[in-house]
Amino acid sequence: MASFLMVLALPHVRQIERATLPNGIRIVTESMPYVRSVSLGVWIGAGSRIERGPENGLSHFLEHMVFKGTKNRSAEDIAKSVDSVGGGLDAFTSKELVSFNTKVMDEHLPLALDILAELVLNPLLREEDLAKEKGVILEEIKMEADQPEFVLHETFISNFWKGHGLGKPILGTRETVKKFGHDMLRDFHARVYSPSNILITAAGNLDHEELVRMIGDKFAGLAAREPLAVDSVPKTHAPLILKKKESLEQVHITMGVPAYRLAHELRYPLYILNTVLGGGMSSRLFQNIREKQGLAYAVYSELNLFSDTGCFSVYAGTAAETAKQVVSSVIHEFRELKQELISEDELRRAKDHLKGSLMLSLESTSSRMSNLARQELYFDKFMTMDDMLESIERVERDEVQAIAQAFFRTEDIALAMLGKLGDMEVTREDLVC
């Protein structure tokens, strides 16, 4: 936002417009005439979810490779182009998306679009860059393997959505990355970076019609293709996995259950439940496990929600001798949320927390740009700030309890533990709630 006064004057008004190019590329913009920046993003429906077996990690690998040079820009030119105007250029890969995005002053929007178009449409993907980038990615995989929380997360997710793309690592594995070839990379780019699989969003001081014209000039030559096949809804599993690593000082614990998809109509009561359980310093997990019992430094709950499924999980790191006590404490909180309504005070705090987080999350052009993509891809409609705030305010205590009762079922709880476990055992009876 341009200033605090502007936030007060235009709290919930969003000037959002949509367009679709003849080849199928979707464009969504939000005009914010009271700012001087523009954030622009190109979103590809890729990630581990759409990768075939040997391709695991290829979305992320390709995201790296496009920065090695394009038809009209070297790797150094790409870096200098945005740096020289004080802007930022970034990219990331998730389970369901790849994003290339930039933020610049409004007068540099043509430059920003030109760079993103080059990255997406004209990467060189040279064979000589392949081996070097494999080395980079393999080191990234090794780095992640040295982080217990990451190892635990991958262990949990790979078993929770076993056999499905959502359960595969975004980076791929050492085995898959080593086998990536030049033809595989080019074929994947041609198949996945297709018009029906591309969304472009922008927010800031921009003119919608002019930007659509500019995007058309850059992307109109990309031929339409058949949409990618939609994969199946993943089946969830509830294993109990204890993975020994004697070199660790702590035992790391993740417990999780299936949750709603991102656009589910009951997502707001679910957000409240997550906030009450482990969404902050005043949450039950933080207060009871850290503050009252002193069993953990890090303890929280989180939601990982996707287009057709989700996971509601709890993480804690604790000493080996208190690991089972932490598991019991988490189960106790599950049980309490099922048996008793949350207090009016908890409900009020959770609502205010969500409202504040929502308002703060939409202050910048970059966050607005990302929000446009999220709403277009997952909700297929645009909700006003008032819509979202009112949805939060409408949540009742019995709705939160009903979700706890539906989700926190003993037979559905998956568990993964990593650390100095000795002869520790955890059975399904330990998870009765």
Feature annotation, model-predicted:
Residues 53, 57, 111, 132, ...:
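A generic structural signal for residues located within well-ordered alpha-helices
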Residues 240:
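Flexible, small-/acidic-enriched active-site or ligand-binding loops
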